[in-house]
Amino acid sequence: MIHLLRGQAFEIEGYTFFTMGGASSHDIADGILNPYADDFEERYWFMRRMRCRFRVNHYSWWKEELPSDEEYAEALKTLERIGWAADYIVTHCAPDRIVKKLNPSYTLDRLTTFLEKIRRKAKFHYWLFAHYHDNRIIDERYVLLWEQIVQII
């Protein structure tokens, strides 16, 4: 098992992989609860009954879901080091253009925009990503995986 860290490049069986994990939670419109708050249990069950869209800090949501400034900088350094070329790019969410092809109403954010810059500049064979709960191939090179396992090498 290999833990592919954000903003790193890996050589696996002669293939280069660039990785950049992370994604914004889109089911937190009603807030993020503090599990240590005095009224946590009451608020939690109220929000469940009301079918609110929320998460619980450090249980179902972490601020580290998105890359830090240091991780973005490290990713750019890595891409420079490998000449902006990889056989495979592996991310959790997709670049802006692909997000909008999936669903024009999906929200773009700092990470999807960062990935869009990579999409425009990098040379790659395939881009594999998840997050959007579907299995699809978009524009021949972008592979959205959800319930599928695919062999790539």
Model-assigned labels for residue ranges:
Residues 1-5:
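Glycine/small-residue-rich loop that forms an oxyanion/phosphate-binding "nest" at active or ligand-binding sites
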Residues 6, 20, 91-92, 129-131:
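Short His-Asn-centered micro-motif
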Residues 8-9, 80:
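Short secondary-structure boundary/capping segments
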Residues 9-19, 88, 138-143:
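Beta-strand-turn-beta hairpins that frame and shape the catalytic cleft
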Residues 10, 24-25, 133:
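Short, flexible micro-motifs
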Residues 12, 84, 122-123:
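Generic structural microfeature
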Residues 15-105:
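Active-site-proximal loop/helix segment associated with metal-binding centers of metalloenzymes
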Residues 94-153:
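Conserved beta-sheet core of the metallophosphoesterase superfamily
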